[in-house]
Curated annotation (Swiss-Prot):
One of its GO terms (biological process) is meiotic cell cycle. Residues 103-120, 149-167, 192-232 have a biased composition (Basic and acidic residues). The gene is EME1A. It is found in: Nucleus. Interacts with MUS81 to form a DNA structure-specific endonuclease with substrate preference for branched DNA structures with a 5'-end at the branch nick. Typical substrates include 3'-flap structures, D-loops, replication forks, nicked Holliday junctions and also intact Holliday junctions with a reduced efficiency. May be required in mitosis for the processing of stalled or collapsed replication fork intermediates. Plays a role in DNA repair and in genotoxic stress-induced homologous recombination (HR) in somatic cells. Its EC number is 3.1.22.-. This is Crossover junction endonuclease EME1A. GO terms for cellular component: Holliday junction resolvase complex; nucleus. Residues 278-478 form the ERCC4 domain.
Length: 546
């Protein structure tokens, strides 16, 4: 069994160390304590075995107890009795409590040269029967070249250091906890009575405002629904809307050959009209007597943004010959901004042909009449202006019928729900009635979008939807910057199209390019044929040009 080595400093003498059976054959041991151990030569006559104690701890079978076996003999004798039969290594040190001249040298510096000399704790040689002799502890002498003052350990100083370290750790934990606390968890100041009453009043006011806002929003929703219902009633009842429209006819219109037929046609349809002097001669404008709530919902209120200009053939030819047509357009625009304009002529072509025939048959007696650039002037109205149209009627009856039909259409358009591209076609799909996959297209919005692209057949749309089930999945590839534009244009060309009869074909390059350029076009007003030819790739949208 291993020996028991006790190292202690100021231990209680009443508590005995743990007992352990002593070895009978104990070998004398020299214990060298050194921070930098160095092998030393052993005297030839010595039988003791030196052991060097480095900074590493001792093994488990050796127990070192630090003890202050002072100079007093009483303490040493008590220790001898306690450790009788035990192998104990004792490191002596001066007791801190014992007064003496040595205590004045307690805090003197230790020189480095003195540490290089080894400290030795030697046990004298013992006989075989020395196990029962307690005097072996007395023979233990601590031979060291260092003075006791130099190697003395200040236990109080160590306690102070450990106390400071503990306090520092506690402060770190407290600061970390305080920083982790949020602003909400910090203790709040106690509110006074006035502050509490103010906070309660503010909460009450806030709740009342929220209630008022909810009530106002509900009232607005109810009014909006009521207005929509009234509009639907007006849209369904055509006669009701027709009775509310009023036509304001200029005096010059009735002076023409079609004045009588026009008035009779309006009376047959029970349309209200007024003959007056309009700011623009030969014009007809319309207004509607609608309820205030419906009139306020319209962009121009009770006014209808449309103006009709009626000309006889001779008057229109003179207007073009004098180059006053374009000036007339600007004058009407100044008077009726944002209005749609229409030039209506009566017997224009027949009048021109008649004049040309007379001039051709009798050039000598002719007045030298030449055809004015009517075609060029009408073409300019369509190409150079937005919202400017022209209409040529054969006779007076057609003029009167056109005015009556136009009046009824304007009356219904004001209260009718606005049409969109998808609402123009039945069920919002552009496909033939005999399409085999009609039910699939009606159930899928993505298929409706693909079919709405011109020249994209339903079977091509279905092939694309199988590979890319949504618009987002296709646009994700189209928006990938790592793929070139050429690859994106021909992305869909190899998709298989299932045919009921014959071989399966592919979508093709033309359809793939059309789908890409239509979906990725920067200008929504451009035509699809132009987009297919790459027009959108070289032009900027109107918003960027301003």
């Amino acid at each position: 069994m291993s020996d028991f080595i006790l190292i202690s400093d100021g231990e209680d003498e009443a508590t005995p160390p743990p007992s352990k059976r002593a070895r009978k054959n104990r070998t004398p041991t020299d214990l060298n304590l050194d921070t930098e151990p160095s092998l030393q030569k052993q005297p030839p006559g010595s039988a003791s075995t030196p052991f060097f104690l480095d900074e590493t701890p001792l093994s488990d079978d050796v127990t070192v107890l630090k003890s202050s076996f002072g100079s007093g003999t009483g303490a040493s004798s008590g220790r001898e009795n306690n450790f009788f039969g035990k192998r104990v290594i004792s490191l002596e040190s001066d007791s801190e409590d014992s007064p003496g001249p040595e205590s004045s040298k307690k805090y003197e510096p230790v020189y480095t040269d003195s540490w290089k000399k080894p400290c030795r704790l030697e046990f004298g040689s013992s006989d075989a029967n020395s196990d029962d002799d307690p005097s072996w502890m007395r023979r233990a002498s601590f031979q060291s070249s260092l003075s006791k003052d130099a190697i003395e350990v200040d236990s109080d100083h160590e306690k102070e250091d450990t106390g400071v370290e503990k306090m520092g750790r506690k402060k770190q934990t407290i600061t970390s906890k305080s920083t982790s606390l949020s602003a909400d968890s910090l203790p709040k100041k106690k509110m006074s009575k006035d502050e509490k009453t103010r906070a309660a009043e503010e909460k009450k006011l806030q709740k009342e405002q929220e209630k008022l806002q909810k009530a106002a929003s509900k009232a607005e929703d109810a009014e909006h629904k009521k207005l929509e219902r009234e509009k639907q009633k007006w849209a369904k009842e055509k006669d009701k809307a027709l009775k509310c429209i009023v036509a304001w006819i200029d005096n010059k219109v009735l002076e023409g050959s079609f004045g009588g037929l026009l008035i009779s046609g309006l009376k047959e349809k029970c349309i209200t009209y007024h003959v007056t002097t309009n700011p623009i001669q030969r014009s007809i404008v319309w207004t509607m007597t609608l309820p205030e709530d419906i009139a306020q919902s319209l962009p121009l209120g009770s006014k209808i943004p449309y103006v009709l200009l009626l000309y006889e053939a001779e008057d229109f030819c003179n207007l073009v010959a004098k180059k006053e047509l374009l000036e007339n357009v600007y004058r009407v625009r100044d008077e009726y901004p944002s209005y749609t304009m229409c030039y209506l002529t009566n017997k224009l072509l027949s009048y021109v042909n008649k004049k040309e025939r007379v001039e051709y048959k009798d050039p000598v007696n002719g007045c030298g009449w030449r055809k004015p650039p009517i075609d060029e002037a009408i073409a300019k109205l369509s190409t150079h202006y937005i919202g400017v149209h022209s209409r040529h009627c054969v006779d007076e009856a057609e003029v009167a019928d056109h005015v009556v039909r136009l009046t009824s259409s304007l009356a219904h358009c004001q209260v009718r729900k606005k049409l969109t591209r998808l609402s123009v076609y039945a069920d919002g799909t552009l496909m033939s009635k005999n399409a085999a996959d009609k039910h699939l297209i009606r159930e899928s919005i993505w298929l409706k979008v693909l079919v709405a692209i011109p020249k994209v057949q339903p079977r091509y749309a279905i092939a694309v939807s199988k590979k890319y089930p949504s618009l987002k999945s296709l646009l994700k590839v189209y928006m990938d910057p790592n793929i070139s534009v050429h690859e994106k244009e021909f992305l869909l060309k190899d998709l298989k199209v299932e045919n009921l009869v014959g071989r399966d074909t592919s979508v093709g390059e033309a359809c793939s390019k059309r789908i890409y350029r239509v979906l990725m076009s920067l200008d929504g007003t451009i035509k699809t044929d132009d987009v297919e030819n790459g027009a959108a790739s070289f032009t900027l949208p109107p918003s960027d040009l301003i």
